[in-house]
A protein has these predicted regions:
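Acidic, PIN/NYN-like endoribonuclease modules and their adjacent C-terminal/linker elements
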Residues: 1-5, 54-55, 121-146
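Feature 3881 marks metal-assisted phosphotransfer/nuclease machinery
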Residues: 1-17, 25-26, 43-44, 140-146
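Mobile, glycine- and charge-enriched loop segments
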Residues: 14, 62-65, 71-93
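PIN/NYN-family metal-dependent endoribonuclease catalytic core
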Residues: 14-17, 27-63
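Short, structured coil segments at secondary-structure junctions
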Residues: 43, 74-77, 128-130
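Active-site neighborhoods of divalent-metal-dependent phosphate/nucleic-acid chemistry enzymes
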Residues: 80-115, 119-121, 125
């Protein structure tokens, strides 16, 4: 990942943050996942999100976990993307029929050339194909926090 001399992520770093990272960051107090989330949010990295993921953020962060300021911070920090039919169709074969939201998230990564950070095993096949790059949370912590 590209860093400046200050150690901060550069503007040309691009990510889509799956909801499971955000939940892991807040459900058990301050953890390395929390460090990761805020390092990314407060950096110059580009953050992308599709409408499906934004709705997941709202549902889990705001309504279930009650951490409205984090939802507002994420909502204001991300660039909302419509992945488009071509990206959706390219990603669809790698996911079970029941995982439509994951297809949309992957298509968002494909359209924006962003790294997906997730612990969702449904992304394994598409990562192995090389169509998009997927990091689990542990790898993201290692890559971005050292």
């Amino acid at each position: 990942m590209r860093r400046r001399a200050t150690g901060l992520l550069r503007r040309d770093s691009r990510f889509v943050l799956d909801n499971n990272l955000v939940i892991a960051s807040v459900k058990s107090g301050w953890t390395r996942s929390t460090d990761l989330l805020f390092t990314i949010i407060l950096s110059d990295a580009e953050l992308y999100c599709d409408l499906e993921l934004l709705n997941e953020y709202e549902k889990y962060i705001h309504k279930f976990l009650g951490v409205y300021p984090l939802f507002v911070l994420l909502r204001n920090r991300i660039t909302l993307v419509d992945p488009g039919i071509d990206s959706l169709m390219s990603c669809k074969p790698y996911f079970p029929e029941s995982q439509y939201a994951d297809v949309v998230h992957a298509a968002t990564c494909l359209k924006t050339a962003a790294v997906m950070i997730t612990n969702d095993a449904h992304f394994k096949k598409i990562n192995e194909s090389g169509l998009i790059e997927v990091w689990n949370i542990s790898r993201a912590i290692k890559e971005l926090l050292g």
